[in-house]
């Protein structure tokens, strides 16, 4: 009877400890011409593994508006629906505004102390550049790529922490960010896991994708068993 009571008390203690454990924070960066709310809505199936765990997801908006034909940048910046992390379209060699976005995200990271980062398309490239400096516990890049901007690419290539566990989700039919471009980003990380799907430029939500995302995050967090002071990012 005494043994059963001790087991019950131990289980109650573990449950209380788990309930009191701090929530893990994840920074989620949207793609070009999206915003945080759009990413949240379009990634509902993909992020189901996070809903079942103690994760707190953050969806900031990009600093800049995306210009349409005949629209100037000031008008675009006033549009809160179509945002970007830097000005310019795919293929341009100079990213105008990335320095401002980088500073803003570093400030947000220092304040919130994120544990992981998720990015889609332009947001994945931005998240990868942040990984090079901020060293999160894990990174998930959907349709990511190495930046075309030479200075940004050089900073990523020279500063990347190859040991950060990363998951690279690649659509084999993606014509906007080709699988080859996404693999070039994946090859920068020694701790990479590559997950392909038959779709195009999208965030997949199939059950097997969710299962692999959950397995990746669990394994990545298990790798980080040092004291929190050493594990948590410090700028």
Region spans (language model):
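Short beta-strand/loop motif that positions the catalytic acidic residue
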Residues: 168-170
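Post-His helix in hydrolase/transferase enzymes
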Residues: 205-219
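Conserved alpha/beta-hydrolase "acid-adjacent" motif
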Residues: 38, 175-181, 204
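Active-site nucleophile loop of the alpha/beta-hydrolase fold
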Residues: 62-63, 139-148, 199
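Short alpha-helix in the alpha/beta-hydrolase fold that links the catalytic acid
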Residues: 41-44, 153-154, 178-187
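Acidic catalytic loop of the alpha/beta-hydrolase fold
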Residues: 148, 172-177, 201-202
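Serine-hydrolase catalytic machinery in alpha/beta-hydrolase-like enzymes
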Residues: 23-116
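Gly/Ala-rich beta-loop-alpha elbow adjacent to hydrolase catalytic centers
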Residues: 118-123, 127
């Amino acid at each position: 009877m005494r043994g059963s009571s001790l087991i019950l008390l131990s289980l109650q203690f573990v449950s209380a400890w788990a309930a009191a454990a701090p929530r893990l924070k994840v920074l989620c960066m949207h793609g070009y011409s999206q915003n945080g709310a759009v990413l949240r809505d379009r990634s509902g199936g993909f992020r189901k593994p996070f809903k079942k765990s103690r994760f707190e997801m953050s969806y900031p908006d990009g600093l800049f508006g995306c210009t349409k034909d005949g629209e100037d940048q000031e008008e675009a910046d006033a549009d809160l629906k179509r945002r970007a992390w830097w000005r310019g379209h795919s293929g341009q060699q100079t990213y105008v505004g990335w320095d401002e976005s980088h500073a803003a995200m570093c400030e947000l990271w220092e304040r919130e102390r994120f544990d992981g980062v998720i990015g889609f398309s332009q947001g994945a490239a931005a998240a990868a550049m942040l990984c090079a400096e901020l060293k999160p516990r894990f990174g998930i890049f959907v349709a990511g790529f190495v930046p075309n901007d030479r200075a940004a690419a050089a900073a990523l290539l020279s500063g990347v922490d190859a040991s950060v566990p990363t998951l690279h989700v690649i659509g084999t039919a993606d014509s906007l960010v080709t699988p080859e471009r996404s693999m070039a980003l994946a090859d920068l990380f020694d701790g990479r896991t590559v997950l392909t799907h038959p779709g195009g430029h999208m965030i997949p939500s199939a059950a097997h994708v969710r299962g692999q995302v959950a397995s990746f995050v669990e394994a990545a967090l298990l790798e980080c068993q040092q004291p929190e002071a050493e594990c948590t990012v410090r700028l």
